[in-house]
UniProtKB/Swiss-Prot annotation:
It comes from Phocaeicola vulgatus (strain ATCC 8482 / DSM 1447 / JCM 5826 / CCUG 4940 / NBRC 14291 / NCTC 11154). Keywords: Amino-acid biosynthesis, Aminotransferase, Cytoplasm, Pyridoxal phosphate, Pyridoxine biosynthesis, Serine biosynthesis, Transferase. One of its GO terms (cellular component) is cytoplasm. Its cofactor is pyridoxal 5'-phosphate. Pyridoxal 5'-phosphate binds at A75, S76, W99, T147, D166, Q189, N231, T232. This is Phosphoserine aminotransferase. Pfam families: Aminotran_5. The gene is serC. The modification N6-(pyridoxal phosphate)lysine is found at K190. It is an enzyme of class 2 (transferase).
Amino acid sequence: MKKHNFNAGPSILPREVIEKTAQAVLDFNGSGLSIMEISHRAKDFQPVVDEAVALFKELLNIPEGYSVLFLGGGASLEFCMIPFNFLEKKAAYLNTGVWAKKAMKEAKAFGEVVEVASSAEATYTYIPKDYTVPADADYFHVTTNNTIYGTELHEDLDSPVPMIADMSSDIFSRPIDVSKYICIYGGAQKNLAPAGVTFVIVKNDAVGKVSRYIPTMLNYQTHIDGGSMFNTPPVLPIYAALQTLRWIKANGGVAEMQKRAKEKADMLYAEIDRNKMFRGTVTDKADRSYMNICFVMNDEYKDLEADFLKFATEKGMVGIKGHRSVGGFRASCYNAMPKESVQALIDCMQEFEKLH
């Protein structure tokens, strides 16, 4: 039976990315060695990093003066590195979910943190829009897609100060005006690669402005100067990321990824809105995520939640259980998710509806 992988992360990767990475695990570039056992300074590996950086810049139209870094530690480490490197006195944060809240918590150790707005009172079921960013803030931090709650910023915001964004779960799913940001970062295990590598796009001249001492490994300048090679980088995930970047380019680039994402999301949201048994959880439909589609049983069918989960699992659906903090269901439809799998979930929902 075909499995349909709706996991929120680590998550689905294009089949050809898995196959090419698997081949490299057995024999990298005809070297007779696995990519897991070569030196990161081997002559065959530097071109992997160089091409991955070049494709990042090409696909996202990154302006001159920015570096692309491949680091470790996940977005969770970036929550600390961001204020360490950029917060001198005051930073502004938009609180749209657990991950934004965690980022804010880390920033408070380095300076004043202004929460410009929050949707916590509504369990983060919408993205606040009525707020003012302080003009004297060092930066304005946003989380562009909220995997737990299914909300997403579909366009870059305007800000009177430089912006920083956690784009862990929607990178390469839409065009970005990178010039609005001094830093874009994320864990790669949702839309780019297997777990283990963190991507950072950083504006070079924004680094080195704070007065505090920054430990070597937490200083972006270290990694800019070292070309992501100051210490041993996550070799295998970087290689897989390169294969994904090639796949995105071969499949029409970021604009095509956005088109496909909207088509898949529209299909599933239409069924959620039509089906008598389900309802969406996001209160403002304009905020509905294309990446993580969250829904619950309507109240009169609430006692059938476990039955639907079992039914869907038997039909090959994987990873549709909602996050433990909110319950319900979540279908993560990242770039690699085929439309056929979304249709399979819709068919499953319709079949379950007919049974009840």
